[in-house]
Regions:
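Short, charge-rich amphipathic interface segments used for partner binding and complex assembly
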Residues: 29-58
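N-terminal acidic leader/helix
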Residues: 1-23
Length: 59
């Protein structure tokens, strides 16, 4: 089960992105998370996805 808290979720996903070397799209897909909804949630909470570094960051 994924963390519901946005900060914990970002930490979890960044760890998976780094350790498992996968794309955000694939990681969200295997965890049954809608990409567009997730990107909106990131934005609402002051985060963005840095494609060059494959990492979720604070705005």
């Amino acid at each position: 089960m994924l963390p519901n808290d946005i900060n914990m979720l970002v930490s979890f996903l960044n760890t998976k992105l780094r350790d498992d070397d996968m794309s955000l799209e694939h990681l969200l897909e295997i965890n049954d998370i809608n990409l567009n909804e997730f990107m909106t949630r990131l934005d609402r909470n002051g985060y963005f996805f840095d494609e060059n570094n494959n990492q979720i960051k604070v705005k």
